Amino acid sequence: MASEGDWTCDANDAVQITLVQPGEQKPKTLSSFHPQFTYPIFGDDETIFGYKGLIIRLRFAAHDLRPHIHISYDEKFKTVGDTSAVDLIKTLSPFIPEEAFSTLPDYENAVQEDKDAKDFVPPGKLVHNYVTRGRTYEIWAASLADPQVRRLLDRAQVFVSLFIEAGTPLETEDPEWTLERWTVYFVYEKVKPPTPTASQYSIVGYATTYRWWFYQRDSPEKGTVTNDPFPGPEIRPAQLPARLRIAQFLILPPHQGSGHGTHLYTTIHTACFNDSTIVELTVEDPNEAFDALRDTADFHILRPEFLKHNVNINPDPYAELSKKQRPRRVPTSALIPTKLLHDIRSTYKIASTQFAHVLEMFLLGEIPTKNRHAGGANMSRLLVKKYNATDPNERRYYWWRMLVKQRLFKRSRDILIQLEMSDRIEKLEETVTNVEEGYEALIKVFTAREEALMAKQEESGESPETAVLEDSVASSSDSSTRDQRTKRKFTVEDEDEEEEGESEVSKRPKV
């Protein structure tokens, strides 16, 4: 009898995902790729027992994601006692729509003969379009309360389990008032239809966002007592002040590295910026790749505003104070224009922790490289001289590190106060160095992108926005950038703040 290993295969290799569109005689493959992981379906080991030569092919119509699953194998394990091959249909059924289990001829015929395909338009409203590398793309936004959106999303739900770590598919059968809180953004490429009846749209990716009610403690408007009729008028979720949270965010593998993620993120940010009821934009449990994308996109958004107001670190916050008068704490308001920065953050609706990351990265970039750790700054001398260093840029760098340490201490105070003072100082020093390394990597990426943009503008006269956005996702997926970001995230826990007592319902999907 063959060993168990002979009957076990890698689930990630066995599953093949294919996007198809009508061809001359049968559906034509547009792209084919494997999942990033399959543990939500096949367990932590991501293996399938009981088959040799197993192929699980998931096909999706490129425009409306009409699904089909086809399973083939060379040999199946015969049950011995309690040991049997994995029941693939039973295992896959919770993750794939029932319509996917039709016969292959029926599916191919449905794709070939779909008379509605040529008139297909993504649901919702066209909110952004752009051209990248000579190809045209569109982003559409629609409410989850729209039945067409729910149908399309239900077909795409399996992507959550295959590409979004710790992701949970959305519950699309909730009451309408709950569904209205959700907006789904679809990214499509406009392609040349291969046949007269084929669609001109091909899916690229999508994102889901939802509104989370935001309690405003200090409302400028004082309520007045009136004799209004009871019951009062109906209040919809869209009328209430809210945080907007990005829940799921996915660009399919064939389209990654081409800037679509940044276009999608900035489109969501623009919608947030233009909605007077949205207070700020946040992200649920972002991974390192998305963190890098978000940082570079927000840096691109905020940097012109920082430059416009000459935001920088004051190297002499104690200029008018004697040594006895100097406070023991970091003089934040004397170092940076806190009121101005608060106004900028509120205007652009960036979450406070994310804004701090972008601000710190900008301030670091304003210090000459030779005065930074990455440029060979004399750290021993800085440790001795501190804010008394002769060079004002050395003083700026000293105060930059102190500002970062102050933020990190506030965020992780409960953990750090349990350490001895020497260990606490060592931990903060280590963490701020890791944070700085992460920022240096992102600054390097952004600087290279800006230089490429300038060259591209000179050659073709292309708009700055388009040229910058094309390169951003490729940059965010750079392995060294991800490594640096990982250091920053796990040395000291530093996440977007959440309201205490938040229900699990609000955190169903994970990015």
Curated annotation (Swiss-Prot):
Residues 455-511 are annotated as: Disordered. Its EC number is 2.3.1.48. Pfam families: Hat1_N. It comes from the Eukaryota. One of its GO terms (cellular component) is nucleus. GO terms for molecular function: histone acetyltransferase activity. Coiled coil: none annotated. It is an enzyme of class 2 (transferase). The active site is at residue 284. Belongs to the HAT1 family. Catalytic component of the histone acetylase B (HAT-B) complex. Acetylates 'Lys-12' of histone H4 which is required for telomeric silencing. Has intrinsic substrate specificity that modifies lysine in recognition sequence GXGKXG. Involved in DNA double-strand break repair. This is Histone acetyltransferase type B catalytic subunit.
